[in-house]
Structures are given as structure tokens and as C-alpha cells.
Amino acid sequence: MSSLVIVASTDTDFGFLPESLNVVRETSRSAAVECSQSDWEELKPLLEAHACDAALFDVRPKLADFKLVAMDMDATTICNETLDEMADMAGVGQEVKAVTERAMLGELDYEASLRARVATMKGVAATLYEDVIVERLQVQPALQTWLSALDENNTHRILISGGFQPVVDHFVEAFDFDAGFANRMTIEDGRFTGELEGELVDSSYKARRLEATALALGIERSQTIAIGDGANDIPMLKTAGIAVGYHPKPAVEPYADIVLRHTGYESLSLFFK
């Protein structure tokens, strides 16, 4: 038998679950059930109907056992897609947003689509970085709840983003991440050239960076957690000990041990012991 952890989006007594199950209510919104894979498959429609997220573990993990968390930034740590917001402020929003959505769904080559979107920034003042941070970008609700749980366990945390380094640096400092890694747009005379410089932070880079950081810290891959939402996060999710899909695109869900559809960071630590 495996351990099924159920987290509801609102307070509940879990009375909607079959009486045949031995349900152990842990908090006002979470419960644990010992069940088989087939039981879990049968429960999925019921849990979806009651706006519950759930994860099945052979052995339920302890949060204290994890020493490194790698998080995507756009639509994972923050609510927005940074380049979409920058493009909107620069007057090319609709064009760029459509390409971003297809790239995150895995329908387009990531590098080609990113370079095409970055090209639309040519000639735009680089002060747009500061403007988008102040005027547009919003942190995901209850992010600090999750980060505080990590702090209690002295867990290292890093941001790995296909976004841009100055924006990542802002959130690294604001939320006390250990480090942040992202792409860089070339700037000349205070304006974007429409090109990228340095190593591309794509899907394979994200996985390599997680693995390299763990190695440098003497942490086993089994002691890592990765959190992401888009197709470019899949290799990173596959590398980690526990993969979390944060309101993920459909292509991401099969690779996630925990999928947050109905809940968010206020609930993530409830899946662990």
C-alpha cells in the first residue's frame, strides 16, 4: 500500500471520501490515506470534483530530508511571464504572448522562440527591467509560507529561469535565495540590441544547474526538489528527487510527483511529513 496525501483548497472534513478508506485528517485541509494505485486512479475524478490536490507516495517524504530546492521564476515564483509583460509595455505584447504560450506548451523549439521574442526588444530602453519589476511583476500568493518552511529546515534554494538576470537578481535578494541563474539580453548605449549573450538558460541548462549545484553542496539528487510549470522545466523536474508542478501545463503533469492545480504554496509543505 502507498500513502496518498490529499490537500483541499478550503477547509473540509473529507466526508466525501468513500467510507471504506481509512482517512486520517491531519489539518483542516489535509488528510492521508493508505491506498493502492488502483484506488488512487478511481479517486482522481472525485478529488478533482472537490477541488483537491493529491499525491501518491510509496514512502511519504519528510521535508527535512531535502537540502536543495530549485524553482523556476515565471509563472512559478511570480505570477507573470516577464518577457510577456516587458513586451506589453514596449507595445508588442500580443505578438510575444502568443509565442510564449506555445513555447511553454512545448509546441515550439524553446531557443528559437526565445530568440524571436527577444528580437522584439531591439531598441527598447534597458530601464524597462526596473519598470516591469515595479509596475507589473507580482509574487505568487503564499510564497513566503513555503520559503519559511524551507528556512525551518535550513534548505538551500535557487532560482533557475529562462527569464532575465536583472529580474532574477531582484527576487533572489528580495526572498533570500542562495543564487539565481537566467538569460541576459545584450545592452548597448542603454538599449536592448534584440540579442542574447552568454550561455542560454534552456531546459537542459536548468537540469544541469540543479545537478551541479547539488554536487557543489555535497547534496544527493534524491535530496532535491524542483518546482516548475512549463515544458522547459521538464528536464529539471526529472532530475530532482521530488518534482512539483505548479499550476503546470498539461505536458508537465506526467513528470510531477506533486501537481498543484487547486492549491498553492500555502499547501505545498502539507504533502511532506
List the predicted regions and their residue ranges.
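Non-catalytic pre-domain segments flanking phosphatase-related domains
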Residues: 1-71
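Cytosolic catalytic headpiece of P-type ATPases
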Residues: 109, 119, 126-128
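Active-site neighborhood of HAD-like aspartate-dependent phosphohydrolases
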Residues: 61-108
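C-terminal cap/substrate-recognition subdomain and adjoining C-terminal extension
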Residues: 128-273
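Short polybasic/polar patches that bind polyanions
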Residues: 48, 88, 104, 173, ...
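Short coil/turn segments at secondary-structure boundaries
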Residues: 98-102, 114, 146
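Long, charge-rich alpha-helical interaction segments
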Residues: 116-121, 138
